[in-house]
Amino acid sequence: MRRRNLIITSDSDSDDGGGGGGAATASTPASASASASFPSVSGGGCGDGWPSPQNPRSVPVQFPSPSSPPPSPPIEISDEEEAEAEVVVEEEEVVVVEDEEEEYEEVEEIEDPDGDSPFVDAPEHISPPPPPPPPARTPMPTPTPTPTPTPTRPPVPVWAAPLPARTPTPTPSAPPRAAAPSPAGTPSPSPIPPSSTPVSALSGPLRQVDEFLRGLGLRLRPEWLESCAAGVPGFYGLGGVEAMARRCFEQFLFADMNACGAGVLPEGVGSMHNAVLDGPLVLQVDEIVNLSAPLRERYRDAHAGPKRCLKLSMTDGIQRIYGMEYRPIKDLEVLAPAGFKIVIRNVHIRRGLFMLVPEVIEILGGVDDELDEARNRLVSEVNKPPRGKRKQGGLPLSSRATLAAWPTNANATNDAEQGASVPRTVNTPHPTRLGNASHASQVGRTTQPMVDNLIPHVVVSNAQEQSRHIQEITMQGQPTSLNRHNKEASASYRYNAQCSISGTTRAMADEHVLVSNAQEQSPHIQEITMQDQSTSLNGRNKEASASTSYRYNAQCSISGTTRAMADERVDPSFVGNNVHEQMQRVQGITMQDHISASSESKRELSVTTPSGYDSRLAPHGVGNTGTRSGEATRSSNVDDGINNIGHPISLCGENEKPFTYIFNMLADWGVQQDTVPYIQGKIKGLITSVKRFQYKQSMQYDLYVYIDDGSFITEAFVDRDIVQNMIGLSAEELAAALSSGGPAQANIRKTMKAFEHFLVNFEGTILIELNRDSSVPIVREMNKGCSSSDAWQLLRRVKTFSGQGYMRSLDFMDTTP
């Protein structure tokens, strides 16, 4: 039998309805059974495949649509109105066409292999098909399957007997398919009521509490209830079952339902379709995601409205189910704490997905600390500023966010190869607190864990161990020619040895821009200094004084030579594993070089961190704490190359370093913001992306970019003069040229394309400024590329780190993922 569909078309030009009436008369027998279900196919009903009210299906209520009007009643054609069937609504004509040329999208899902109509009215008593397949009836509750070991005729009346009693109960069963009678596609019948579940083996009061909570839609594990009762003082004396249940419920709000929930959802809820769960059902929301936004904007606050669609990941402790915000729910927030609890009643299910509307959900509150911390790490990773086109550990953003939320171990968050980089020192996309003292303290806290990995093992860890090494050097490393001097000379030598070790320590720490034990070393150095100076002042022997001066200069030479050798770091084996080997190697060089190195003795007692930028408001912001003058004259290959090139910034004036780091500038600005109006510094970095570029509204250039120098990623404002010099026009002239048209407009577009290309590929030195009036750094100068002197300086640092084998743990230079 060929299937026929009823199609209604309007014909305003027809003179009479004879043809249409004949067609209607002919189609009456074929369309009589399909008229009740016609709106679900053509979209006249609810439009989502639901049966019409005339069809006694298992679902009693249609799913409410938020935007469509109420469903119109289906068009029915009876035998009494065959003559008037052509007059329907505004001269509509009933035409019967065959299904060979017309295809519908929704018919494909429910096609019937036998050729009959796929919509069949369910009879009052559902009976199994003539060959009753036993697997198709397995979901139906049977009294006992033991009397019928094989599928024979006796089980048929046994199954048919309880069916009339179950017909009033709505079951979320899918439409019957003759081609797929397997039980796997049939969802579970109705949700199991709490009273039908077996009661756990609990004590008398706790059993009553468990039954009371089940009546509210909450099932908890017995061991959790017992631990809760044991942890609450005076639990059994609260005065009744309701009071004890309330106290357990309060504790449950701040617990993880994945560990304490016993499951309240029916089995196989994820495979249900066209079903309604009455509830109440208490669930936990582990995560909320805004599906209407891209990944980088998915974890940002968005108000409830037609443009927002939230996806909720929920659990009852046993099963995980997902819900979709079908209509705006004002009580739900994108950034709600993870692990809060909700109650759901009368929720509709489509393809295993809960369709959430304001009427079916109620927020109970609560939070799970572990889930919330993981979610905060994920949000921090997703909301980081863009990194440009550099590799991100070979992982996409979604995978890196997952690793950030649940790191495998404590070191995974600091490993750049794993892609998880949440604990790094990267600011938020909207840095508005650069000048706060709290920000400076945060930078200091972030710096502290890095110090232990950056200072090499050759640097003595604390003052006590350093003092012990100095005494051993004093007893073993004195030249034999100096043994004739008195006790004062020996004390002075110890002082000079201390100065040498502190110089070596300071040189290694300067290259890492951090000093881990300056506070511990300074008091000890001062103590030795005061003691040795008093010894020198009490001495009256002129020869002893001369030898003291000689040894002081010699040891300063040891310090300078050691620092130069550490800077070059070509041979890793040169640096010994302890101070004894280092001093024995350097003493031979020192005895020949002490005269030329005597000029280095002025700066040996200070332990400073070179910042490389001007905190005293110099015009170009390069500070006075750069490389030392003797460093370039004694170092071999690399430093000789620097001498031959000659850089006006790094080798003139007060011998500044070529560039500094944003990380250091932020730390220093947090300390000096109350005393100086601004600070400036040069960095070596690149522009990762452009955040905003406007010129029409305010008739002036507003260009915000993200810059990265390897230590920090921050938003920065580009000076308007730089933009105007690059484009060659003011903002007003640019707007007028773009709106004029003609050749001028084409030329301006080429200029803008060139400026865009410059920003995308920029990498060089940037002069930035931090002041009180701006919440973000200001770019004052931009010079693409770098000089050869800067490259040599950077190469020296890289060779220093690689020679010691610490590149893998060097988080200070690799803080961006």
Swiss-Prot record:
GO cellular component, one term: RecQ family helicase-topoisomerase III complex
UniProt feature, compositional bias: Low complexity: 24-41
Composition skew (Pro residues), residue ranges: 126-157, 165-175, 184-196
Compositionally biased region (Polar residues): 625-638
GO MF, one example: nucleotide binding
Bias type Acidic residues, positions: 77-115
Stored Pfam families: RMI1_C (PF16099), RMI1_N_C (PF08585)
One of the GO BP terms on file: resolution of meiotic recombination intermediates
Chain residue ranges for the region called Disordered: 1-203, 595-639
Quaternary structure, from the entry: Component of the RMI complex, containing at least TOP3A and RMI1.
Family statement: Belongs to the RMI1 family.
Physiological role: Essential component of the RMI complex, a complex that plays an important role in the resolution step of homologous recombination, in a process called Holliday Junction dissolution, to limit DNA crossover formation in cells.
Protein name, as recorded: RecQ-mediated genome instability protein 1
Organism encoding this protein: Oryza sativa subsp. japonica (Rice)
